[in-house]
Amino acid sequence: MGELPIAPVDRLIRKAGAQRVSEQAAKVLAEHLEEKAIEIAKKAVDLAKHAGRKTVKVEDIKLAIKS
């Protein structure tokens, strides 16, 4: 884990209204976002395979997010 850069996550927290963000807070949110993204991506891969494709399409991602 730990592949998401901290700076963009820090900016997201600030967009939500925070004036200051600890590095640890940004790291924890980044880890959670990465876990959620991997979960969605795995569902999308399964959907693409089920459709007989190797390529994950935008529809797969959208369906994976909804499920």
UniProtKB/Swiss-Prot annotation:
Report residue spans for region: Interaction with DNA. Answer: 20-22, 54-57
* Annotated Gene Ontology cellular component terms: chromosome; cytoplasm
Location of this chain's protein in the cell? Cytoplasm; Chromosome
**Keyword Cell membrane on this protein?**
no
UniProt superkingdom: Archaea
Q: Where would you say this protein principally sits, based on its record?
A: cytoplasm
Q: Which GO terms describe its molecular function?
A: DNA binding; protein heterodimerization activity
Keyword annotations for this protein? Chromosome, Cytoplasm, DNA-binding
The record's listing under InterPro entries reads: Archaeal_histone_HMF, CBFA_NFYB_domain, Histone-fold, HmfB-like
Alphabetized SUPFAM superfamilies for the sequence? Histone-fold
The function of this protein is: Binds and compact DNA (95 to 150 base pairs) to form nucleosome-like structures that contain positive DNA supercoils. Increases the resistance of DNA to thermal denaturation (in vitro).
Q: How is this protein organized at the quaternary level? A: Homodimer or heterodimer with another histone. Dimers then assemble into higher oligomers, with the DNA wrapped around the protein core.
Family that this chain belongs to = Belongs to the archaeal histone HMF family.
Question: What protein does this entry describe?
Answer: Archaeal histone B
What species does this protein belong to? Pyrococcus furiosus (strain ATCC 43587 / DSM 3638 / JCM 8422 / Vc1)
